[in-house]
Amino acid sequence: MLVMNLQYFAHKKGVGSSRNGRDSEAKRLGVKRSDGQAVLSGNILVRQRGTKIHPGNNVGLGSDDTLFALIDGVVKFERKGRDKKQVSVYAV
């Protein structure tokens, strides 16, 4: 009877620390002004990637999908249909 003892070893060195240790910096996305909060014209309301929240009344959409207030007023988060959200600014 022939008994074989096969052992497999790594064919590449287990390199860890020199090739690890990279991560991108946080992008600081999210809601910047909450519902009912007073804002000035130009204030950023939401920073986002894609239009997860849509612009409503008196809210502008930046080239990077940032939502910002067009007038001085109060922030109001609303539903738009069944599955969409929007943010509006209403004058006080």
Swiss-Prot record:
Keywords: Ribonucleoprotein, Ribosomal protein. GO terms for biological process: translation. One of its GO terms (molecular function) is structural constituent of ribosome. Residues 1-9 form a propeptide. GO terms for cellular component: cytosolic large ribosomal subunit. The N-terminus is cleaved by ribosomal processing cysteine protease Prp. Pfam families: Ribosomal_L27. Belongs to the bacterial ribosomal protein bL27 family. PANTHER family: LARGE RIBOSOMAL SUBUNIT PROTEIN BL27M, RIBOSOMAL PROTEIN L27. This is Large ribosomal subunit protein bL27. The gene is rpmA.
